[in-house]
């Protein structure tokens, strides 16, 4: 998948990558094993002055992949719309097997990006700060029960990046997102555990124990949690 991302980057398509593939790159650079965070899809942002047509997107991606020497066919299975990303399948031309998918948001608020490198492969991705802010925004609302993987991601992120509360708030504001009250995360721990138990990483990757994940993420987020929850840390009574 990183080869596809490199081909897109080399082509000049106005795409920046985000989510799992960026996190994997950060973890890999920090010394984690490649299989720590496995994924079967690529997430990205496409930002242009003029909204691209379906044909323009498919043709641009296909041309980039062809130039990269990969025998894949790009197929659009979902056109983008309001609050809906474009969905692409990358298909092996020889077997017609769907190798992985790409979800591409189009002309959402522009976010800070940087160049990443994994084993000599370069691509443009959202900044670590943006990645953290996006995941905190999810965990702060009841979306956390559907996006339990963001809790796991924050567990790993906490081992690599410091949490700068002022920069997080600023990043959320710039990307037109808000932070919730964390009531689901704080008050419904057993429901979270249930969601976590059902969740399976792609590729058969082993999950760390839920209690360890929950404890470390709660500590990591202490500066944005409600005062009552934050006070636990001052009293030494965190759970």
Please describe what each predicted stretch is:
Residues 1-15, 25-38, 42-239:
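Structured mid-to-C-terminal alpha-helical surface segments
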Residues 20:
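An acidic- and aromatic-residue-enriched active-site/binding cleft used to recognize and process polar
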